[in-house]
């Protein structure tokens, strides 16, 4: 995530905008209008339980994350993006634009916040109704309420590295060989009864200078994204540089609710992300990070 929000969703329920939205808002799809994904691939809100995995495989709790995000399609445009909090009354916060330097994922409008405990997270981001409002490049106003419900987080994944069909230490990654990243089965994962999107798995790797030099893909942006059925993700030989330190995460995301809003998907999850640092073997590549100041 850094704070790593990418598609870690919380429980999301889409309600009709009437009766809970700001005045003079346009409800998408009320008269059969189809907007589609030319500007926005999807949007939603989430809560994520985050842990750091140590070299011995143990996990350290590093707190929780709330986020609200609008994922912008390539060449798309979003303006006037905000989210109305359930309390205090009239608490409307702007979503900020964030450009992605990665070739793997696109830009977002976002808001995020951290907490040490679930109770603190719920105090700062109550499990109640939030209202997304934004304007697409085509001039359509999306105005939809989302509501958090009381559900459990996914079980925290454990990250396992394998090369040449052998489990390896996280400081012994050979960059000239395919790296197989795996994890225990995502047993809580399930197919989506609505047929919109099944529960998801994400894998991402950051270098010291660029986030997401590797990303398993977000739905609607990459065809071969991972669902709960996936057992591994392969980083091809030559992707990583020798003699470098990288950071990564594996996330298991339960999509508790899925909807299609005038052709724009909206989801939510309670997700579990495990972060880990690892090193590649070999002499330091001159194109790598080198000694940091």
Model-derived regions: residue spans:
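Bacterial Sec-dependent N-terminal signal peptides
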Residues: 17-41, 284-293
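Bacterial N-terminal signal peptides
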Residues: 8-17
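Conserved aromatic anchor
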Residues: 173-193
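Extracellular fibronectin type III
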Residues: 142-143, 255-290
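Recognizes extended acidic, P/S/T-rich segments that occur
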Residues: 81-116, 198-241
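Solvent-exposed N-terminal domain segments of exported/luminal and surface proteins
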Residues: 28-120
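Beta-strand-rich modules
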Residues: 238-260
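Short, solvent-exposed loop/linker segments at the N-terminal edge
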Residues: 59-60, 169-177
């Amino acid at each position: 995530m850094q704070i790593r929000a990418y598609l870690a969703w919380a429980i999301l329920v889409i309600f009709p905008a009437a009766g809970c939205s700001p005045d003079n808002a346009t409800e998408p799809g009320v008269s059969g209008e189809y907007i589609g994904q030319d500007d926005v691939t999807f949007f939603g809100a989430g809560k994520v339980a985050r842990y750091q995995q140590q070299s011995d495989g143990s996990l350290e709790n590093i707190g929780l994350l709330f986020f609200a995000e609008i994922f912008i399609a390539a060449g798309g445009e979003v303006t006037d993006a905000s989210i109305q909090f359930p309390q205090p009354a009239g608490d409307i916060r702007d979503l900020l634009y964030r450009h992605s330097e990665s070739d793997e994922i696109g830009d977002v409008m976002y808001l995020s916040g951290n907490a040490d405990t679930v109770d603190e997270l719920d105090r700062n981001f109550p499990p109640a109704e939030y209202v997304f409002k934004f304007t697409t490049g085509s001039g359509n106003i999306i105005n939809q309420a989302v509501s958090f419900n009381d559900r459990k987080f996914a079980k925290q994944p454990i990250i396992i590295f394998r090369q040449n069909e052998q489990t390896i230490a996280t400081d012994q990654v050979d960059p000239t060989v395919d790296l197989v990243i795996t994890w225990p089965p995502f047993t809580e994962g399930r197919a989506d009864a609505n047929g919109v999107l099944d529960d998801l798995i994400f894998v991402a790797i950051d270098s010291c200078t660029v986030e997401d030099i590797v990303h398993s893909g977000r739905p609607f942006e990459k065809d071969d994204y991972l669902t709960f059925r996936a057992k591994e993700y392969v980083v091809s030989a030559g992707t990583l540089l020798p003699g470098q330190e990288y950071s990564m995460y594996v996330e298991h995301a339960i999509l508790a609710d899925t909807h299609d809003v005038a052709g724009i998907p909206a989801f939510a999850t309670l997700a579990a992300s495990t972060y880990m640092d690892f090193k590649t073997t070999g002499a330091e590549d001159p194109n790598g990070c080198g000694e940091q100041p």
